[in-house]
Structure formats: C-alpha cells, structure tokens
A protein has these predicted regions:
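DNA polymerase processivity clamps
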Residues: 1-24, 39-157
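Short hinge/gating elements
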Residues: 34-38
Length: 157
C-alpha cells in the first residue's frame, strides 16, 4: 500500500484501488485532556435495558433529524426523553447513582454504537456536566468510550 499526502488530502493506493480523503482542518480534540478521572456523576445501569430503551427512541426520529435523547439522572432513576414530529417517548430505568443529579443530551446513534460493542451486563457512565463528554468504561479500563453531548433547548425537556 502507498500513502500520499497533500496539504488538504491523503491518498491511499493499493492494488488497483485508489482512495482519497480530505484532511480535518484545525486542531483535533485533545483526548488526553478529555480523559479525566474527575466526574460529578457516576451511573451503573443494565446495558441491555439502556440499549433497548434508546433503540426504541430512534424509531421516532428520521435520519435527517438531529434530535437528541435527553437523559435526566435523579436519585436512583434515569429518565430518557425524546420528542420529534413523529411522537415522543419518556421511559425510566432503575440505576445506581453516585454524585450529583444531571440533565444531558446525546445523539442516540453514538450512544447505541458504544453500547452495542460492550459485552458487559452492567455499564458505568461517568459524567462531569451537560457540556462535557460522557465516558463509558469498565473498572479495569479495558475499554473507554467517549461520547460528546449535544445541546438541546429547555423546551425539549
């Protein structure tokens, strides 16, 4: 395989195939700084229950819609809400919570992508605030998934 770089592109050549991709402009996220061990809220939740709930929510949104799933964590409960032109959903899941209550929004597809590849029965989410990334990781740190939150209007809640 051959690799070629220009100022704005990268070119991959292998066998009789050539691929071209545009390079990202600007600075990329500094992942090391984002992977903090500090958190305000730690949540343990049944992975299958959370995944099924988010999966059901995606039935209410079209691919072109950028509707976030709103997650409200209070006491021993996680409320998941989504409202779209098709309908709305509001579900509750029992959780183990350590730390502060939080209200945060995520692109449901990104959350589903992370949860689908985790083999554990229970997952642990670490949250700092509604504008900081969420981490899903196990105790041994054999995996870490970073999911960026999305902004949402208070009218969506």
């Amino acid at each position: 395989m051959n690799l070629f770089f220009t100022k704005n592109h990268i070119v991959f050549e292998f066998d009789e195939t050539t691929g071209v991709s545009r390079l990202i402009e600007g600075e990329y996220f500094r992942i090391e700084q984002m992977l903090s061990t500090d958190y305000e809220t730690k949540v343990r939740v049944n992975k299958k229950e959370l995944l099924n709930c988010i999966d059901r929510a995606t039935l209410l949104i079209r691919e072109s819609d950028k509707k976030p799933i709103i997650i409200q964590i209070e006491d021993g409960e996680m409320r998941l809400k989504l409202t779209s032109g098709v309908g709305s959903m509001n579900e509750e899941i029992v959780i183990e919570k350590e730390g502060k209550d939080i209200l945060i929004g995520f692109n449901p597809k990104f959350m589903i992508d992370a949860l689908r590849v985790i083999d554990d029965e229970m997952v642990t989410l670490y949250l700092v605030n509604p504008k900081a990334p969420c981490f899903i990781r196990d105790e041994k740190e054999s995996y870490i998934y970073l999911i960026l939150p999305v902004n949402f209007s208070s009218a969506s809640v």
